[in-house]
Structures are given as structure tokens and as C-alpha cells.
Amino acid sequence: MREKWLIGYDLSDNYAQISFLSDKAAEPETLSVLPGAEKYHIPLCLRKRKGFNQWFYGMDALKHKEEGEMVTDLFRLAKKGEPVVIEETGYDPIALLTLYVKRSLSGLSVIGDTDHVEAFMFSCESLDERTVEVLKQVAAGLSLKTKSFFYQSYAESFYQYMVHQPEDIWVRQVLLCDYHSDVMKIYRMECNRRTTPMVVYIEKAERNFFACGDYPEEEEKKQNVFTQMDEKMLAMAQELAEGQMITSVYLIGEGFSEEWMKESLRFLCRNRRVFQGNNLYSKGACYALRERLYPTEISGRYVFLGEDKLKANIGMKVYRQGESSYLALLDAGVSWYDARFQTEVYLEEGNSFDIVLTPLNGKDARYGKVTLTGLPERKTPTRLYIEISMTGENKVRLYVEDLGFGELSPSGYQKWTENFEI
């Protein structure tokens, strides 16, 4: 039996990173741009060879400086949607991003034939409607046999990575410091172990920091900058830790590649475990895929409520075999871009029904009335097709179609769409 592979693809504004997980392995591995080295970042750029339809990507694009014009910011350009002009020709920015992703996947020759990729997960900093739309178009253009493409935020990749680590590492809070460019992004993960299932929250914050890599050439001046960085990091770490129970800290990003942490590292290591690395998001994406396709007890024990998660249960009061019952339409904890449910119900009388929203924050359930204006009066029940989905983090779309009641009451072919916010 050939191995099946799960691919976790970390797509940031400046680089990509690829991890892969075999159905025969316990942990993911990460593709290195240099064999034998732990260099995982693939620069997010393309370069077109002047006068030819030949494209270089990643490290090769950086090396071939004299070959032609280079395009950076591929992800931002794709989301912006405006044509990219190269040699007086306009190129679709989503097509360029798709080309980059396809070329970067050529490195997966280490796993053999990509026909055996079972599922693919994109992970990026955040997911709004435009980002999901772009990623879906990229996925459609990759020519992979699998049709199982998924999307998740860095916060959820962090969560998935952590819940697959020994529990003593995250029994209390966990801090993730992601240092790129001149910004320190901080994720704080905490689990409420008093609920069933246990609810995991992640708070996100940003701090301006020193521009990483932009250091003086003179060693003494460079060390002075490092000292200032260390002092600022120490002050920030003390502030983040004040009054908090932090079990472990993860330091990721190019900003931590230089050895400038001295006093700040000593402080973080007091009664805490500190880890450094650069492939957490792509590995977290692999773990998420495995949990989605082959659920373990983790799925039953924990629910993650991130920014892009539905934070309320949505359902209807219905009758089953003469008894009052609850019909779940959407469950809290699902990502808004994955939230979709369809069903058929019978409306016994009238032209309206109620939707029930039950928040997970302990607030009272609230009811919303859906009125089907123009629905004909019938002596028989009306069969309704109902489809519910989400168009944003707090935006719900409800589609209803009149199916009538067989020959006794033919359908009026009426359709209704309602949009509401949670």
C-alpha cells in the first residue's frame, strides 16, 4: 500500500514553508531549501527571464539578478487583484501566486509522486473573505489530484501544534513570539479546563520592534544594537509574564536567528520551557489535516475558538415524531469558511419560523424570526429546503426554497435569502 501524504503549506507575505506528514508517521517533516540544513523559508518571489517565458522562484529568483525583473509581495498582490506589469505585459496576480506555489511544490519530490497527496492545508496569518477566495483559486490551479483543500489561520495552526505536544508543555498558558521584519507578533494560548469540551482561546497582539537583519557592520555597534534589543525584549517579557502562569514559550521567525537574547532569555527560562524554531505553522497545518480526516480523542476533548470561529450554536426548534426537538444547523467552533449545512423541513402553518442562536460565552439564547414573504397559504404543510452558510466571521447567510407538498400543493418556486449578523 502506497503512503498517503498530508501537506501543510505556510504562506506569509514574504515566504512559504512546506511540511508533510505520512499516514505511516507520527510527526510531520519540513522541506528544507538546502538539503541537510534546517533552512525552511522559501522566499515568496518570482523572476521572469527577460524575453523568455521562463520563471525562477524562491532562492533561484534571488540568485538570477541579471536575468530579468523580479516580482515580490505575491500574496499581497493576489489579494489586491490588480494586474502585475512585467515587460509591458499585464499578468494576473493570482496566476503568478499559483505559479509560485506549483514551483515550490516541486521540492516535494522527496515524498515521491504528488498524486498520493491526500489533503492540503494552507495556513496564513488571518483569513478574510478575499484571502479565502484567492486561496481557493490557487488551489484550483495546482493540478493536484486531491480535491481536499483546507484553510486555517496561524492561530489555529499554533493551537493544533500545541495540542499534539505533551500536555505538561501547555498545562497553563503558552506564549508564541513571532518576530519578522520590525514587528513582534505575540500569541497567548490558554485552555479553560473546567468546561466540557475544554475551550482553548488564543489572544493576539503586536509590538513594534527593531528591524531584524538591519544591523551595523561594525561589530561593536552591532553588539550595542543587540543589547538594546535584549533590554526591550526583557521589558516586554516581564510585562507579558506579570501575574500569569506561563508553562512554555516559543520563539519563531528570522528575528531570532541571531544570538542577541541574553538577559531576556534567562528571564523566560525561569520555571518555563523555551523552544526556538521556524516550522510551527506548517507542522500545525499537517496535524490539523490528520485530525480532520482521522479524528482522535483530541477532537472530542478540546474546541478552539479563534477569531475565524463561529462562537454560537445555531439551530431550530422542530418536532420529531410529535415531540419538540432541536435541529442543529451550525455548531460553534467551526471555521466560518467551512460552515455550511442543508436540510429539508416541513412548515405546518404560517409563513415564518425561528432560528435559535446560543452563544458559548454564557449569555442567553436569542431567537430570530425568518419570514417567508409571499409564501402561499396551503391546506397542507409546506416542504422547505434550507441552506445555511457564513460569509464572514460574524455574517450568516440563510437560503430557503419552497418545495411545495407534492401534487397536492405544487411548489411556487419561490426563494428567499436572509443575511444576519451574530
Set out the residue ranges of the language-model regions.
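Active-site neighborhood for divalent-cation/phosphate handling
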Residues: A95-V163, N278
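A short acidic Gly-Thr/Ser loop motif
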Residues: R2, G8-Y15, D168-K185, M189-N192, ...
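Early-domain small/polar-rich strand-loop-helix modules and first-structured segments
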Residues: M1-E82, A140, F150-Q152, L372, ...
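Glycine-rich phosphate-binding loops at beta-strand->alpha-helix junctions
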Residues: M121-T131, Q238-L265, R273, G277
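Glycine-rich phosphate-binding loop plus the immediately following alpha-helix
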Residues: A16, H41-R49, C191-K232, A288, ...
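Conserved phosphate-binding loops in N-terminal lobes of ATP-dependent enzymes
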Residues: S32-S123, E206-L234
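Conserved phosphate-binding catalytic cores of ATP/NTP-utilizing and phosphoryl-transfer enzymes
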Residues: M1-L6, L144-L175, L280-L305, R378
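Acidic, glycine/GT-rich loop-and beta-edge segments that sit at the periphery of enzyme/chaperone cores
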Residues: Y287-T373, R383
